[in-house]
Each structure stands twice: as C-alpha cells, then as structure tokens.
Amino acid sequence: MLKVFKNIFIIFARHTLQFMKKTEKYQLLYEQIKALLGKEKDEIANMANVAAIIHKTFNFWWTGFYRVIDNELVLGPFQGPVACTRIAYGKGVCGTSWKEAQTIVVKDVHEFPGHIACSSASQSEIVVPIFKENQVVAVLDIDSEKLATFDETDKEWLEKIVGLF
C-alpha cells in the first residue's frame, strides 16, 4: 500500500511541476539541492545529483558539468546524450565562460562565434562558472533543443545553485 501512495505522490509531483512558474521551480529546486549537498562532501557525487535534479525538473536536452583539470575542461557528471570530453580554455561557450569567469547565456548557439557543436540538436545554452577561492574550478553547462530557452531567471538561480558547491 505504501508503494502505491509513493507512486501516486510521484505522479502528482510531476504533474504539479509542469504547471509551476520557472521561478517557483527554481525556488523548490534550490531548497532540494541545498539539503542534498549539505549531507554529502564528495564533489563528483554532488555534481551527479545536481545534474540529475536540474535535468529532470526542467527536461533540458543536456545538463552537466565540466571540471578544470590540467588547464582544460574535462567532462564530469551529466544527464543527456554523449558529450564532448575535453574543451580548451577560451573555446566554445564553456571555454569562454571559464576564461571570462562569468555566466554566458546564448539564445541561439549557431550565432555564437566558435560554438562547439557536441550535438546538432542543441539550440540554446547557458554556462555558469563554479568558483573556489576566486578561481573557476568547473562550469555547469545546460543545453536546450529550443531557441532562447534561457534568460535572467535561469542565470540568477543557476548562479545561486552553483554557489552551494
């Protein structure tokens, strides 16, 4: 019986989530991630869970992390199709976000100079740097198969979320 109620709750939660405003989703997401990260100290485990929860909440095309290792971005935990494994400093949206140490919102990836097309389905993208001791140590990269998916609301909340690391 408990399993039935749990399944009903999951269905209800998914149904409710699709009718929530973006800001409401992020508020809920932030609190869930904050609680989740408070219990675990392993960064890879945390990145894996954060990628999964963001990906599931918003149904993005690709959600994941690239970590700075030996002066390049190396693929970390992600949700979605196969991705580029390594990205050079200053290259593509991820490398540029790392170089400029700031969030980049791209309404149309085909208009971004030097865009690295890991997937032809990607149409818009947001990349948010993660800082430790004022240095970029990783980036959160999210792609959508729709144009102009990301805006200031995404930027504000995703920066707040990566600030939890």
What spans do the regions from the language model cover?
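Cationic, amphipathic, low-complexity segments that mediate targeting or membrane/lipid association
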Residues: 1-4
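Short, positively charged and aromatic/hydrophobic N-terminal segments
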Residues: 6, 10-11, 16
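Intrinsically disordered, low-complexity terminal regulatory regions
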Residues: 17-77, 160
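Juxtadomain coupling helices with adjacent low-complexity linkers
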Residues: 29-30, 34-36, 138, 144-165
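Short hydrophobic/aromatic beta-strand element in the GNAT-like acyltransferase core
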Residues: 62, 127, 139
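Regulatory sensory and allosteric helical modules in signal-transduction proteins
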Residues: 68, 72-118
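A short, aliphatic-rich beta-strand micro-motif
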Residues: 124-131
